[in-house]
Structure formats: C-alpha cells, structure tokens
Amino acid sequence: PVQAFAEVFRHFGIEPTSQEVREPMGMLKIDHIRTMLRMPRISALWEEKYGRKPEEKDVKELFGLFEEKLMSILHLFAGPKPGVAETVKALREKGIAIGSTTGYTDKMMAIVAPEAAKRGYAPDVWFSPDSVNQKGRPYPYMIFRNMEALGLSDVRGVLKVGDTVSDIREGKNAGVTTFGVVIGSSEMGLSREEYESLSEEEQKQRCEQVAEKFLAAGADRTILNLEDLLKTV
C-alpha cells in the first residue's frame, strides 16, 4: 500500500517522502493517513496550499480515495513474503498456533485473506481493527482477541513477530515477547531485488539501522528473516 498512500497525497498536491509514508506502516490505514497529516512538514505544506491546517474531514476524504485505489490493486500484493509459508508449516508441526493482526479493514481482508491462503499462508485466526472498535496498532487489543479465540490465558505464552515499529509497540503494549523481522521489512523499505543489489557492507548497515529502530521501540529481539524464528522457538 506504500504507493497508494503516496499517490493519494500527490492527488491533493502534497509530495510525501518515502520516510513519511513508511513511518506509520502497520497502523489502521485511516490512522496512517491521520498520522501523516500531523507530520510537521506535511501539515505545513497543507496549510500553505489550502490556507488552513489539515482537519478530520480531510482525513476522511484522503482515506476514501486511498481505499478506492487500494481495493483495485490489493489482490496483487496479498502473497506471503518468502519463507513465511514454510516457517508457519514448521511452527504448526511443533504444535504452535498461528494468529494474526493487521492494519487492513475487514473489507480489505476479504480480498487479502483468500489470496494469501491460495499462496500458502492462512493463520488459524486473524483480527482487524474493525473487531476492536478501530483501536488498531499500537493498541494491544487485536492480540488479546487472538488470545481469546485461541484459548490462551497467559501472555507469557505468546510471541509477537512483526516488521514495523507499530507491530513492536503493539506487542509490548500487550505484554508479550516481541521480535522484529529485519530483511524485507516495511521499516527497511527495500524489495528483495533492491536489497540483494546492495554490497555486503551496505546490507549490514541497513540491517543494523532497522534492528536499532525495533530495539528502540522495545523489541525483545530482532531476527534477520522469518526462518530465523525456528532457531529460537
């Protein structure tokens, strides 16, 4: 959805940077837009263009256009990242249940979930912000809904794995052990091809930068990729 966020802001005459678009990744999508409009540079550009600061009606207008754009392309981006299906299969063989939280709405997940399942990823349960009164990440409530559905009573038996700062905050707010996945993460913002085109030293530097962000947000540990999870669980 990165491109959809950028295109929506461009439609309103604001050119966001890649960092501004990616910083709120993982949040409920309308909260993502709300957060971007509060960013000092974007807010100042909006005021310069429209003669006033961004308002809630602007949030809703941007989100309406964003949702329209996203729904038309979402099926193209619903596949799991490399290694996810295999890792989930291995975890299930160890008797571990798989739950999921998302920044997508139920309407969006009606497209994403079936497409992801076709491509090998289907969690036992998933919950969107629609199921928790729009209190998505970094609120912990989607994790608690997963625990309820899976019959878990102790947060010490839960491991949250995510690739955005809001994922990390969600996990820590829920009181569960939380890992950040570095390579291929929204926080890194590189495609697999872009990452592999970097020199070994550049890859190391980018990984360290992302890991530091996750640890600063409270992550208990960082892992380079999801396959590394099997070494710790």
Short names for language-model regions:
Residues A85, K89-A90, T105-V233:
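Asp-based, Mg2+/Mn2+-dependent phosphohydrolase catalytic module
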Residues L76-F77, T101, K135:
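Glycine- and other small-residue-rich loops at beta-strand/loop junctions that grip anionic moieties
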Residues P24, T101-G103:
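Structural motif
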Residues S18, S100, T222-L224:
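A structural preference for short, hydrophobic beta-strand core positions in alpha/beta folds
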Residues P1-A85, K89-K94, A110:
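N-terminal helical cap/lid subdomain that shapes the substrate entry/recognition surface
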